[in-house]
Amino acid sequence: MELHQLIAHKEKRWRATLLVMLAVLLVLSALYLMVGEVFLSPFSSLSSFEHKLLVDLRLPRLMAAMVIGAALAVSGATLQVLLGNVLAEPGVLGISGGASLAMVIALFLLPVMPTPTVFMLAAIIGALVFTLILVGMARAMHLSTSRMLLVGVALGILSGAFVTWAFYFSDDLSLRQLMYWLMGSIGGASWHHHMVTLVLLPVLVWLCLQGQTLDKLMLGETHAVQLGVDVHKVRWRLILAVSILIGCAVALGGIISFVGLVVPHLLRMAFGSENRFLLPLSAFAGATLLVFSDIWARTLLDSAELPLGVMTTTIGAPIFIWMLIRSHDAH
């Protein structure tokens, strides 16, 4: 097979996979809107209560699952290129923890309950600070994969400790509700909270279009400069975009781990590392994974609802362990 035929075949395979993923997402979305404590049949007219349940509860929650899953998956894929580490992920590296810590600080310092916009800004600042710490340490100290993971885990533990202290000394009910939410939950998502989505979506689309630039960065700084990339400027733009996505995702749904690790890594294993295709496919696959996980979180138990973060951790942790073993065997 000639080179141009091979490239055309590969592009066709990526596009076919993208269409299949979109179809799966649409089917799961329809199922998501139907199932729950009250089953909504698509073949019968809805009562006023059922219509309100669909429009005011299930639809905004479905949208939250989609945008959070897409944002985390694309952020993970971008971080893996920026840090040169296939195991990089916002939750594992402690970046999500930094966003949650900033939100708790905002909750303590402000005299009134912060609005979703204030929470979002605090989360973005926290994610940006932790991302800069990681990128700075990785570049200055030339950290190996294992050492970078240790630094990320340490940052996550540190932020988690501060958050736990804050909850322990607080009698405020809102803080206790926030603690459940920080475990990863979109149960309280409403249209009001989707002000955050208005900020997230343009950044997500922009980042999905940066695939060719990321492909050049993967060749190394020297080659990227020769190919016309302003590496310094591009790196800072990508860091800011990733921080905005992670901050918005945490503000909307709390800490949801492993989506940004599992989705891009499995897609790379199956289809290759071309970021111009990988990033859009990661967005659809991340959205699909989170919609699927939240269906299980809502329906697995009759008497309670599981935090979404628990479901993604249950799915992602075994895959993460397998990836660590595989990485060790490769060396």
Swiss-Prot record:
Transmembrane portions of the chain: 20-42, 62-84, 91-113, 117-136, 148-170, 190-209, 240-262, 277-296, 303-325
Subcellular compartments: Cell inner membrane
GO biological process, one term: cobalamin transport
GO-annotated cellular components: plasma membrane
Taxonomy, superkingdom: Bacteria
Single GO MF annotation: vitamin transmembrane transporter activity
Gene3D superfamilies the UniProt entry points to: ABC transporter involved in vitamin B12 uptake, BtuC (1.10.3470.10)
Membrane topology, as annotated: Multi-pass membrane protein
InterPro entries attached to this UniProt entry: ABC_BtuC-like, ABC_transptr_BtuC, ABC_transptr_permease_BtuC
One Pfam family linked to the record: FecCD
Keyword tags: Cell inner membrane, Cell membrane, Membrane, Transmembrane, Transmembrane helix, Transport
Oligomer status and interactors: The complex is composed of two ATP-binding proteins (BtuD), two transmembrane proteins (BtuC) and a solute-binding protein (BtuF).
PANTHER family on file: FERRIC ENTEROBACTIN TRANSPORT SYSTEM PERMEASE PROTEIN (PTHR30472), VITAMIN B12 IMPORT SYSTEM PERMEASE PROTEIN BTUC (PTHR30472:SF29)
Family label: Belongs to the binding-protein-dependent transport system permease family. FecCD subfamily.
Function recorded in the entry: Part of the ABC transporter complex BtuCDF involved in vitamin B12 import. Involved in the translocation of the substrate across the membrane.
Annotated NCBIfam families: PRK03784.1 (NF003001)
Protein name: Vitamin B12 import system permease protein BtuC
Record organism: Vibrio vulnificus (strain YJ016)
Higher taxonomy: Bacteria, Pseudomonadati, Pseudomonadota, Gammaproteobacteria, Vibrionales
